[in-house]
């Protein structure tokens, strides 16, 4: 299109033809016409921006070729256009041929090979530094762990394995940093975006502080931490005690992500899907597929929807069922996730139904409050929302109230007049700055006049002295 001289966006208009020809076979073309056309238009605009920027640089290269009486554009420059500015090599070639020039394709391929080698090298270094074989993979499946912490925070389990300094050991003692694997545990292992539990493993002789919990080889659950007291041996019985406050904080944020997901779909459209998440006791981070920034008005609507459902006190139910039954119930599945024949379905009244293996509350009212802190882009077509719930919202609102109180005190005004007072000070400062500028200009003129008055003529030459 560019080579034919078409400057305006046109590709998205062809959608009408596609819909007319294929709409019956693909009904979603009709159902989501507005959304599809908007996405095509946005992508076309982005591509045109890339083409415009690359064309400007390529024109500069062409002028250099003319000035140097050369006929071939170096492969390094062709690769730079491609790698840095996303300018396709075949388009570069077509434009060059239009004006009687050629490109060094062999040089371009050489640069491409170098780039691939750099990527392989970087990946190899990363794997060498951060990837290590899990020592638990050397054991058999008998070390597997059973998670029984959805409804209980405490149980007793037997030590199936201990890892210290990346080696399987039989015992650990006070001060040792280690990994303990139990046959049964109430500790949730990091997964589905939710961080692992923390807490205590103990018996009458020993205490092990669990800092975090992760999944390990052979379906194990790894309690990662340090021995605070006594010694622990394989086959010892240990009571698992999950930190209730931290588990509840994580559950509040996890349940809130489900409410947020539904509210986003209701407000922005059914095209919105989860693209990633992070659930910690302190806050939640939720990535979605969406093609443009979410406006303040939309964020306000989304936030209100979530808080409205919280206030409705909907029961949260978790059931294990067949994947087909879950789909029939309308459960949302995450794109790209692999599910077995049986799945865990988390329902929040009739409002939200999702497949999820994380820990949740019993009722939406336990979320307390929900507050969006920020929204922004993290990749093309992906937006990120960060939010807080429960006590974190209380602390956030308190800190804002204290900030307003301090501002009122500093500006010597009341809260309901704070904005007007701040605006008045800004205008006053602008006026004073203008007056100061005028005074300085006037003083400069006066100084110049005074300097001219002090000139002395010496043999016909005017001499100024300061």
Language model region names:
Residues 1-466:
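A glycine- and charged-residue-rich anion-binding loop/surface
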């Amino acid at each position: 299109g560019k080579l034919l001289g078409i400057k305006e966006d046109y590709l998205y208009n062809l959608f009408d033809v596609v819909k007319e020809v294929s709409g019956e076979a693909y009904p979603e073309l009709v159902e989501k016409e507005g959304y599809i056309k908007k996405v095509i238009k946005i992508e076309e605009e982005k591509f045109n921006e890339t083409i415009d920027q690359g064309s400007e640089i390529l024109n500069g290269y062409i002028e250099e070729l003319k000035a140097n009486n050369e006929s071939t554009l170096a492969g390094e420059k062709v690769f730079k256009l491609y790698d840095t500015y996303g300018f396709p090599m075949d388009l570069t070639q077509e434009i060059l041929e239009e004006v009687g020039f050629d490109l060094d394709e062999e040089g371009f391929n050489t640069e491409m090979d170098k780039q691939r080698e750099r990527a392989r090298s970087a990946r190899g270094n990363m794997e060498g530094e951060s990837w290590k074989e899990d020592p638990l993979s050397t054991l058999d499946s008998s070390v597997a762990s059973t998670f029984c912490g959805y409804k209980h925070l405490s149980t007793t389990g037997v030590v199936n394995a201990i890892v210290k300094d990346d080696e399987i050991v039989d015992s650990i003692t006070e001060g040792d940093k280690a990994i303990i694997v139990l046959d049964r545990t109430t500790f949730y292992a990091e997964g589905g975006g939710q961080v692992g539990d923390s807490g205590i493993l103990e018996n009458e002789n020993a205490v092990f502080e669990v800092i975090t919990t992760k999944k390990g080889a052979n379906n194990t659950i790894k309690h990662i931490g340090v021995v605070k007291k006594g010694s622990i041996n394989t086959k010892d019985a240990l009571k698992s005690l999950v930190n209730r406050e931290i588990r509840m904080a994580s559950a509040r944020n996890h349940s809130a992500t489900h409410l947020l997901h539904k509210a986003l779909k209701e407000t922005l459209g059914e095209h919105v899907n989860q693209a990633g998440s992070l659930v910690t006791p302190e806050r939640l981070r939720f990535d979605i597929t969406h093609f443009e920034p979410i406006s303040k008005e939309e964020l306000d609507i989304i936030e209100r929807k979530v808080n409205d459902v919280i206030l409705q006190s909907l029961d949260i139910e978790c059931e294990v069922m067949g994947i087909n039954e879950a789909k029939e119930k309308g459960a949302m599945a995450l794109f790209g996730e692999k599910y077995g024949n049986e799945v865990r379905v988390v329902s929040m009244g009739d409002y939200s139904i999702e497949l999820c293996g994380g820990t949740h509350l019993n009722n939406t009212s336990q979320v307390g409050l929900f507050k969006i802190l920020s929204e922004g882009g993290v990749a093309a077509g992906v937006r990120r929302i960060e939010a807080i719930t429960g006590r974190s919202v209380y602390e956030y609102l308190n800190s804002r109230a204290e900030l307003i109180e301090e501002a009122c005190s500093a500006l010597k005004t009341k809260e309901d007049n704070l904005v007007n007072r701040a605006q008045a000070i800004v205008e006053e400062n602008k006026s004073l700055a203008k007056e100061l500028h005028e005074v300085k200009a006037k003083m400069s003129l006066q100084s110049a006049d005074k300097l001219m008055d002090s000139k002395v003529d010496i043999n016909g030459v005017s001499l100024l002295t300061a």
